Amino acid sequence: MTDVESNATGWSFAFLRTLVENGVTDIVVCPGSRSQSLALLAAEFADRELLTLHVVLDERAAGFLALGMSIESGRPAVVVTTSGSSVANLHPAVVEAFHQGTPLLLVTADRPESVRERGGGQTTFHVGMFSVAAKGTFDVPPAATPTDAERSGSTVALDALTTALRDRGPVHVNPQFIEPLSSNVPSNVFDTVVPGDLPEIVRESVIADVSAAVGVVVVAGLGAGARAEKWARDLGAPLFAEVASGAHFGPHLVTDYRTVAVNPEFADKVTTVVVVGRPTLARVIDPMCSRTGVDVIVVHVGEGVPYRPTDHARLVDDLVVTGDGDAVSREWAIPWARRSRMALDDRASEPAADVAGSLVEDHASRADFARREMEIQREPVTSEMLVRSVWDATWPHDRLVFGASSLIRVADSTVPGKPIRVHSNRGLAGIDGNIATAQGIAVASRQPGNPVGVTRLVIGDLAAAYDATSLALLTGPIQIIVGNNNGGRIFEGLEVAATANPEHFEAVVLTPQDVNFDGLAAAYGIPYRRVETRGQLTSALTETAEPILVEVVLRNG
């Protein structure tokens, strides 16, 4: 910083002050020269506990860290970068946030517009880089005077925050800074900053009336939340809730909905499908919605491109339920939910508790019991065993995150209902940024007054390798659980697998990798456990005091 007053600093102070006074709590700063006024002031705000500061070297990881915090808290997190390629590295998180409907504030310090087409160093075209994925773009010219800087910083901050909340997505703020890039700020100016609440956003709502009746089905996808479960009960409707929908629980939950949806005994009775959010995990929903005579109502949740399975699907913001759902449920939802639970129990790989065996007293019988228990503990881990064990170990005060791999689909079809917080980047379902997102969720969940829980990320080996540098971000109780089946085994289900050259398919589609996860963990100072058996998995899941990487060698895909 210099003693010469910098309009960049004046703008940055007004910008950050306005965000803090309007409910923003977290800022992620990436290193750089052009953004120094924002970065240095963010540190000052953090010293006074006005903001929580997160410093991240990798802009791609920074974007996903901010995304995770916004997903968990509902508050837009701020990401600050310098100019040039650093901005482009935010793009994966931006498009994921857009398709999820998650608010973010992206602040990319730029050189003045006059040098953009003159080949200036570290200068490119920030504006428009995120295309339609940015719900709003503010290209802010350099302030001419300190008064202009203060006015512009405050106005842009409030407008950008309001846009991100109202339109539920990422907003790009591109301030053009000129020298001097920073200056000292009197310490007493921070005394005037008072943290506030997020502004209230009022939206016009389109509301659909739905009557409880046999034939109504509720589908809960990305972003649905607990209201989907309540609507299912009010309507007396079976609930097809994806595992990360926020509605995978309750008496109407049909866990094997992939089978039920195509069962003629069920499908022929379907008259209305209420879809909340965007389903992403099963192919049976589209055909069910496309059946002749089926009315489709989609309750969108702010996602960038709402789910529209048919041209006649109605897009609404809310529902009003009428009729006697209890009477309908006894005939319609409860029988199918009960059949689903019975089918799940029949398929379960979890061993039943041998209560009788544990009570025997003679030596031979107790030895037999101990031998059987030991055999159970020595069973190799399968995908189903992994997700079920993690599911059973997770409580309402914990957070469970699924990466983009076959494991989330296994969980979606095998775990029973349970009211826990489950997240997954299903906007675009990419393998990038999964570890950083989980850390963001973990950080945001550790708020004063909240019970201290553990965040568990269940991730495939490819996604873990792809986001390995985000291991540097890990703090607090978080488990990175890597299901290692040596490559993208989810693609083994593709039709092309039956006709492609096996060696070529293995090399360019499954792409197996030889990753030393023990070495990766050591490089970032994280404890590591290798798990091959049920007993080892059970033990590893109890190690929750600090970050840990658990590599689970899977017997199957």
Language-model region placement:
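Phosphate/pyrophosphate-binding active-site segments
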Residues: 1-6, 286-406, 516-519, 523-526, ...
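Conformationally flexible catalytic loops at phosphate/diphosphate-handling active centers
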Residues: 2, 6, 156-213, 326, ...
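Active-site diphosphate/adenylate-binding microenvironment
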Residues: 12-15, 20, 33-38, 351-452, ...
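A short, small-residue-rich loop immediately preceding and capping a beta-strand
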Residues: 25-29, 51-54, 72-111, 270-277, ...
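Structural signature of the thiamine diphosphate
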Residues: 26, 72-81, 96-102, 108, ...
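Thiamine diphosphate
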Residues: 44, 96-97, 103, 107, ...
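Glycine-rich, anion-gripping cofactor-binding loops and their flanking helix/strand elements
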Residues: 67, 71, 79-82, 88-89, ...
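Glycine-rich, acidic loop regions that bind phosphate or pyrophosphate groups
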Residues: 108-155, 241-362, 495
